């Protein structure tokens, strides 16, 4: 059964790559284990091409998330992981990257180095980012948060992303 699922999945990826006219490897994001702090570029790098999105983000609570942490909580991995850029698991393992405080673009869209390198190389079609869905938000907006409030994805996503660029 597992083999059947793998064959079916590889067929779906292959067909999707043909439909998108993209190389298969561009559709497959690196696994979280392959991503390190060095793969994160920071919101200022995103701003170079996505100024409207940056300006909209800069007016959100995400842009001020690290400053909202109490001083005592800034050394707790379970708190910091959701208040700086990177996955909570990566931050717990490597510590926060000082130049990337707050919940920046890459906290939700994924590490940007590969995306930026592709775009700068003239391959904007392959400059893909992580798909954002409710599960992305629930990595931090969940019952483990000491200030948890019920999270309604459709209502909240519009507060963060007010622009498509």
Locate each region found by the language model.
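Short sequence/structural segments immediately N-terminal
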Residues: 2-5, 14-165
